[in-house]
Amino acid sequence: MKFAAIALSIVLIASIVAAQDPAVVNAKTIKVKFENDRVRVMEATLPPGVKEQVHSHPAYVIYVLEGGKYRNYASDGKVTEGEFKDGDVIYRNPITHAAENIGDKPIHLILVELKTEGSAAK
């Protein structure tokens, strides 16, 4: 019985972690383009009116290919609105959130998630 409870806990924890992977829970809008032990590069296209599922990122950089207006829903309940401009490059701290395109055109981004800290070139 104790073993079954432990096994169930491990499965539940693994599903929660996987459920917050942006490329898994938002597979229609986010595609992994490259991944190694230091970074994961994803392409995201969010059509007008679409709201993503809640997901998490480690520290990451956004490169805006095609901007637009968005609404961000943070895990702490804070809701903010903003606008990406074409060509913007933005650093973001780790976050659990969902984003919604509130504009009238698709938002197209490259996301670079940073897996390791202090990996400066020598």
Please provide the spans of the model-predicted regions:
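A short glycine-rich, His/Asp/Glu-containing loop-to-beta-strand
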Residues: 27-51, 58-62, 112
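Extracytoplasmic/periplasmic copper-protein system
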Residues: 118-122
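Boundary at the C-terminal end of the N-terminal hydrophobic targeting segment
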Residues: 17-20
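Bacterial N-terminal signal peptides
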Residues: 5-15
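Short acidic-glycine-tyrosine-enriched beta hairpin
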Residues: 35, 76-94
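Glycine- and acidic-residue-biased ligand/ion/polar-headgroup-sensing regions
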Residues: 57-76
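Histidine-centered metal-chelating micro-motifs
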Residues: 49-52, 90-100
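Ligand-binding loop in jelly-roll beta-barrel domains
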Residues: 67, 94-117
